[in-house]
Structures are given as C-alpha cells and as structure tokens.
UniProtKB/Swiss-Prot annotation:
It comes from Acinetobacter baumannii (strain ATCC 17978 / DSM 105126 / CIP 53.77 / LMG 1025 / NCDC KC755 / 5377). It catalyses: N-terminal L-glutamyl-[protein] + L-leucyl-tRNA(Leu) = N-terminal L-leucyl-L-glutamyl-[protein] + tRNA(Leu) + H(+); N-terminal L-aspartyl-[protein] + L-leucyl-tRNA(Leu) = N-terminal L-leucyl-L-aspartyl-[protein] + tRNA(Leu) + H(+). It is an enzyme of class 2 (transferase). Pfam families: ATE_C, ATE_N. The keyword Transit peptide does not apply. Its EC number is 2.3.2.29. PANTHER family: ARGININE-TRNA-PROTEIN TRANSFERASE 1 (PTHR21367), ARGINYL-TRNA--PROTEIN TRANSFERASE 1 (PTHR21367:SF1). Belongs to the R-transferase family. Bpt subfamily. GO terms for cellular component: cytoplasm. This is Aspartate/glutamate leucyltransferase. Its main location: cytoplasm. Functions in the N-end rule pathway of protein degradation where it conjugates Leu from its aminoacyl-tRNA to the N-termini of proteins containing an N-terminal aspartate or glutamate. NCBIfam families: PRK01305.1-1 (NF002341), PRK01305.1-3 (NF002342), PRK01305.2-3 (NF002346).
Length: 271
C-alpha cells in the first residue's frame, strides 16, 4: 500500500508540539501531541490529507500523537467495501433494525443532544477525564468544528437514543465520538453505531470509516480491532489487518511499538 507524504499545502501549515504530559491511554506513560495551529482555517480536502497522515480532530483542534519511544497510537480505518460483519456484529445489526437514522449538522445541536450526552457521561464514564460533563465541554468537543461535521442520529419512534459525531472526508468519514442512551444496553449501540457509519459511507460512494486511534495495550480500545479488514498506519504506510487478532497477538503488536524504530510486525498478519 502506498505511503502518504505531506503535499506542499500541508508543509505550509504551522504546527506546535506540546510538552510531555500523562498519557490518557496507558498508565505510567507520558505523551506529546503535535497540534495544527488553530489560526488555520482548513477545508475538507486539507483535513482529509491530515487524517491520512494520522491526524485527528477534537473541537477546533487537529492533532497527532508524537511520543518518545512509543508508537502505540495507530490510526485505523475500515475499508467499507471489504468489511464483513462477525457474528456479534450481525446480531447487533439485526437487533436495531427498528431504529431510524437522521443526519444533522453539528451546528444545529440542541438541548436534546446535550441531555443525552450528559446522561451518557454520568452513567458510563464517571471515572473518566470527561466527567463531570458540562454544556461548555459538549459544545467545545462536539459542536464546534473547523470543518464539515454532522450528527448521525438514531431514533426509536420519537426518542433520540444515539448520536455519532462525524467529520466528512473526501474519502469517507471520521468517527469523532458516539454517545447513547445508557438504558439501552441490550441494543449494543456502540457496535451498531459503527456499523451504521460503515453503511452510511457506502451510500455516499466513499471508501473509509476512520475510527481514530487503536492502542494495542489499552483494553478499552481493542474493540476497534474487531472491525475487519482494518487498515493501520504503520511506519507511514497504510497496512491491512485481515482478521481479528488474539490477545497474545495484540500484546505482541503493542510490544513492537514501544520504540521509535520501524515495526517488524508479522507480514503474514498485516499486509
């Protein structure tokens, strides 16, 4: 698969790197981030190029991890034309066929969206760094955007039960964040929301759903490896993971990334 290198336009942009700080994924590890100067007003094409280079958007900020002796934050994307549901995903898909999807620009967010977000954070992530939720946090994180962002809403009759915040890309969409009704745990809405995004990208005639970063040594991130085939940005190349990995293989991959040296990961598994 081909490497992606910054075009002249991207070389003209200004970037900043943060001082080391506690890693939000791995205990007892430090992290650094490269940020695009927020003074730049970027369009879909520029954000798409940056995403192919491993950048990610959060609110008005576009960033990429740049850590010393660690490369575990692997940008990952699902090639939608080749994606095949596993048995668990098929069950989640079937279980939610009574839901209706609508699309709404994030700038049209209302109280109903914040109320659902607040419940989700309070009940599902009270131990995380997004607790306690606030309207200001919600707006800065999910409503404000430097690009074309939208909600994929899921409704049960007249009740909003799930919202996926997405960025439009020139080759697909980037899944920014999903929140849902914590009382609907039997629906597996986290799984279904990703499946719904994959199907939505197919209807647009585009190629990928970007799932952000997969961190092999972070158990809470390993759900992303279940969407196969999955493409990973390794050593500047998008390489394909053709099947789900065992816990031992995931740990082996994580160990190989605790260095700044190029990966020698098994080419029979990742191609």
């Amino acid at each position: 698969m081909k490497s992606y290198h910054p075009k002249s336009l991207l070389n003209d942009l200004q970037y900043y790197i943060t001082p080391p700080h506690d890693c939000s994924y791995l205990e007892n590890k430090s992290a650094r981030m490269v940020f695009l100067d927020p003074i730049h007003r970027i369009d879909v094409v520029t954000l798409s190029e940056l995403s192919r280079l491993g950048f990610r958007r959060s609110g008005d900020f576009v960033y990429r991890p740049e850590c010393h002796l660690c490369r575990q934050c692997l940008s990952c994307r699902v090639p939608v034309a080749d994606f095949q549901m596993n048995s668990m995903q098929k069950k989640a898909w079937k279980r939610n066929q009574d839901l209706t999807m609508t699309v709404l620009p994030t700038r049209q967010a209302s109280q109903i969206h914040y109320d659902l977000y607040e419940r989700y954070i309070n009940e599902r992530h009270a131990d995380g760094d997004m607790f306690p939720p606030s309207l200001d946090q919600f707006e800065k994180f999910l409503v404000h955007s430097c690009t074309d962002s939208f909600f994929l809403e899921l409704w049960k009759d007249n009740r909003l039960i799930s919202v996926s915040t997405c960025d439009l890309m020139d080759d697909g969409l980037s899944a920014v964040y999903t929140f849902f009704d914590p009382d609907e745990h039997r629906r597996s809405l986290g799984v279904y929301s990703i499946l719904n995004q994959i199907e939505y990208v197919k209807t647009l005639g585009l190629e990928y759903v970007y799932l952000g970063y997969w961190v092999p040594h972070s158990a809470k991130m390993n759900y992303k490896s279940q969407y196969t085939p999955l493409e990973l940005l390794l050593d500047g190349q998008w390489r394909r993971l053709n099947r789900s990995l065992s816990p031992e293989e995931i740990n082996q991959l994580g160990n190989s990334l605790m260095t700044t040296l190029p990966s020698e990961w098994n080419n029979l598994i990742i191609k």
